[in-house]
């Protein structure tokens, strides 16, 4: 089944839309790409649609030489595996599956006989198939990169890791702590229970006492933006504080709490730098609602198409892309396939009230430009 295109609306300000990120003109053979997504799954249809929309937005802007065939699947890993076998017979490259269990099933099936771009990280003990490249977004990769970034900026001293009881918080805290230890650094972990969106008051009081008696060099927050806001309201904002995409409060200046000013975190260019050249040329996606997670999956779809397009031209080479999800490095050499994503580092700006008034060339007053929520910073990654 061939996919439907995504319409490219005009930019929000009415000006011509920025050019799509430049790539070398397509000079490979005509290629058929199967997009294998759980669009028939009750649980995963919405995430799958976000990926599909991003993939097709990228294809519509750079369609030369590439035919996309959509292969919808259901919930089960076996259904995805059966669909993969059929897709591999009729296509040159397969993009998918999306579900972690389906990727794991495929990775251990022996069925991978075409270049395959998996959209999630399988939890398997055996090496991945030679023709499988995994490009899914990873909480753990983010946390490890934040550890490297923080270590480069804070070369001495202990890190205090703040986490909650949710599984994703534990994963972030564990990945940061492991990488921090590998870098030869010391850390302590404090768990902050929360219920109904509110961090436990007794835990915050204990944290204040701890910081007073044993101040760390920095804080790593495996929390969401709301939890981190409550922590900083309680203990102050003086300590250097790092996080991953989970602490992103969104791009609306009015919704960013003052307590988050100065927090440094990694996230996708798509969600923190809408004017970045790798992002601005693509249509924004509104069908996923206001949450950031659907937007991240849409950006993953954009980059999945771009990686597939490059792979068609350089099946055994190495290449880099300035993508919607970060700076991508792919090596398709004779050894194990390698993929690395480096996300954008930003600091939350202080967007408090201002009386700034600009004067135009005619001497009249004009409205100040929109204030940016995030300031990109060098991470050294």
Give each language-model segment a name.
Residues 9, 13-53:
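Extracytoplasmic "Venus flytrap"
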């Amino acid at each position: 089944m061939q996919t439907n295109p995504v319409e490219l609306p005009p930019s929000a300000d009415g000006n011509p839309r920025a050019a799509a990120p430049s790539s070398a003109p397509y000079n490979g053979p005509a290629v058929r790409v199967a997009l294998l997504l759980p669009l028939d799954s009750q649980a995963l249809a919405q995430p799958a649609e976000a990926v599909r929309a991003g993939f097709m937005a990228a294809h519509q802007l750079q369609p030369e030489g590439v035919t996309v065939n959509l292969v919808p699947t259901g919930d089960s890993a076996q259904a995805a595996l059966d669909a993969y076998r059929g897709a591999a017979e009729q296509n040159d490259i397969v993009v998918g599956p999306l579900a972690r269990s389906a990727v794991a099933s495929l990775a251990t099936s022996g069925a991978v006989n075409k270049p395959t771009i998996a959209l999630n990280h399988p939890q398997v003990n055996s090496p991945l198939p030679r023709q499988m490249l995994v490009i899914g977004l990873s909480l753990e990769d983010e946390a490890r990169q934040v550890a490297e970034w923080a270590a480069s900026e804070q070369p001495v001293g202990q890190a205090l890791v703040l986490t909650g009881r949710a599984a994703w918080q534990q994963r972030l805290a564990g990945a940061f702590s492991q990488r921090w230890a590998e870098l030869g650094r010391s850390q302590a972990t404090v768990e902050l229970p929360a219920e109904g969106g509110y961090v436990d008051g007794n835990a915050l009081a204990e944290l204040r006492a701890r910081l007073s008696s044993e101040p760390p060099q920095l804080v790593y927050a495996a929390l969401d933006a709301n939890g981190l806001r409550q922590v900083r309201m309680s203990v102050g904002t003086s300590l250097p504080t790092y996080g991953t995409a989970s602490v992103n409060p969104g791009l609306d200046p009015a919704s960013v709490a003052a307590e988050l000013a100065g927090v440094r975190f990694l996230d996708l260019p798509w969600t923190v730098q809408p004017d970045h050249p790798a992002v601005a040329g693509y249509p924004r996606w509104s069908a996923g609602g206001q949450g950031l997670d659907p937007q991240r999956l849409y950006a993953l779809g954009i980059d999945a198409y771009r990686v597939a397009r490059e792979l068609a031209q350089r099946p055994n080479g190495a290449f880099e892309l300035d993508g919607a999800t970060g700076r991508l490095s792919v090596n398709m050499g004779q050894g194990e396939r390698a993929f690395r994503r480096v996300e954008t580092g930003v600091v939350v700006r202080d967007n408090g009230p201002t009386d700034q008034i600009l004067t135009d060339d005619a001497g009249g007053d004009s409205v100040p430009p929109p204030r940016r929520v995030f300031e990109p910073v060098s991470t050294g990654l």
